[in-house]
Swiss-Prot record:
Positions of disulphide bridges: none
GO molecular function, one term: pectin lyase activity
Keywords (A to Z) from UniProt: Lyase, Secreted, Signal
Protein name (Swiss-Prot/TrEMBL): Pectin lyase
UniProt KW Glycosyltransferase keyword: no
Organism whose genome encodes this protein: Bacillus subtilis
Summary of the function given for this chain in its UniProt record: Catalyzes the depolymerization of pectins of methyl esterification degree from 13 to 75%, with an endo mode of action. Cannot degrade polygalacturonate. Also displays protopectinase activity, i.e. releases pectin from protopectin.
Gene3D superfamilies: Single-stranded right-handed beta-helix, Pectin lyase-like
Keyword set includes Secreted: yes
Cellular compartments per GO CC: extracellular region
Enzyme class: lyase
Pfam families: Pectate_lyase_4
Family, per entry: Belongs to the polysaccharide lyase 1 family.
Amino acid sequence: MKRFCLWFAVFSLLLVLLPGKAFGAVDFPNTSTNGLLGFAGNAKNEKGISKASTTGGKNGQIVYIQSVNDLKTHLGGSTPKILVLQNDISASSKTTVTIGSNKTLVGSYAKKTLKNIYLTTSSASGNVIFQNLTFEHSPQINGNNDIQLYLDSGINYWIDHVTFSGHSYSASGSDLDKLLYVGKSADYITISNSKFANHKYGLILGYPDDSQHQYDGYPHMTIANNYFENLYVRGPGLMRYGYFHVKNNYSNNFNQAITIATKAKIYSEYNYFGKGSEKGGILDDKGTGYFKDTGSYPSLNKQTSPLTSWNPGSNYSYRVQTPQYTKDFVTKYAGSQSTTLVFGY
């Protein structure tokens, strides 16, 4: 009896002394790097030199994020951490948080939204996983550099099961904001199983200036198993300079889907293009990149850029599914989830 009383007293003291979030765990997809594919994984560059896979905060401390201040405190630095959203995080105006390195930022099954939170890199950023998150922003935050996930430095980023929900827009309106930017020296990125929706401009990939040839070759990027819905232009994206493997994606309700611009090397395969393809808007080809498509539906035409000689099979192994399978899969499983994550391959 005395032993039991002593144990109970110690346990009660621990409840008082330990921080509440030690006992505030929430269910989240603690899947580590399961499902990782493409350039963010084990890959080679065009010279055959291998680089390590993205690991994020693997084996690091699990920290439950309850506020913007928590996010700012723990997303920076280089210590490996798995940061789990315990609450939806919201700000009344644009709030910028700088990304460090060796982090996994993951939404719980119940709480996964970042509203008006804008994540950006620095020279110390890299090896980061973003998973099971929903990005939302107010429509009035619509300037040219108002981009909720802005990656321009560092290597090894995996964006997986993330929803960029956008907002209503007018095609003739003045919105200039985008959903995602990857450019400058950011490199070795995979976007997978994610959903981009309801925005005038979608993704801008590669340095956004046709005269900055020092960025030729950046980024190496895999865009696979994603759902682009109601993006007026740039879904999958406007691409410059880098190597872009665009496979098994579904784009629907668009005016223009793939924009081929300065020195982009694009290998497209087995994508499904829905409403909008009948207007001939699948390819917006500036004639200044390199492009090849195989197996997409419907067949792509209006290509003016020369064929690319690059094939992503020289960088990593992968497999493809049919366009119809892709459409069915991503409409069911792409974006943030409230239950188990299902990965495309």
